[in-house]
Amino acid sequence: MKKILISLISLIILTACVSTRYSYYPVSSYGINKISISAGLISEEDENSPVEYIGISDVRSNVDEPHKVKILSSSIKIIDKNKEYIVKTNPKSGYIYIYKQGVVITDDFKTYIGKVQLDGGTIIDIPPLSFKKNVYVESYNPVTDTINAGARTKRLFNGTIDEYREWKNK
């Protein structure tokens, strides 16, 4: 009985995991509150993973009522480490797949997307945006999360990569 109890306690304690996810967000939204812009990585768990896409979505969108965003520019400009890239867009998609077009970005970058149109007809001219790498770190335990549904994952950190390195070294 004692061995079972020790095994059970060890299982609960030793199965805790920490999940770290990386992504890019604009430093400032420049007052644009109708759309959300972010950039996703090929592998969000790898700090050095290149950017796969830039996504633009309508903040009104939800599962029951999706709203589309149409990129009006045929291409966008991306500046990374003083290199300038011109990337083609797909007017039928709110995503700009930059990695598929041979652009490899692993650091902070700037982009000019231009104009987008919401499905209601509203046109928004997005100013040049500076993207910074962000980190989201959470702790979870599959065993205790299952037993106690009210005590799910715990956010440990959410911020830029520079803030994360400073937090990690404390």
Regions picked out by a protein language model, each given a short descriptive name:
Residues M1-T20:
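Sec-dependent bacterial lipoprotein signal peptides
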Residues S7-S10, A39, G55, G114:
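Small side chains
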Residues L14-K34:
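Bacterial Sec signal peptide processing site at the extreme N-terminus
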Residues S19, K168-K170:
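Short, solvent-exposed mixed-charge patches
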Residues S38-I76:
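Short, surface-exposed binding/anchoring microloops in extracellular/periplasmic proteins
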Residues P50-V51, N82-S139:
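Short, solvent-exposed, Trp/other aromatic-anchored flexible loops in extracytoplasmic proteins
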Residues G121-W167:
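Short beta-strand elements
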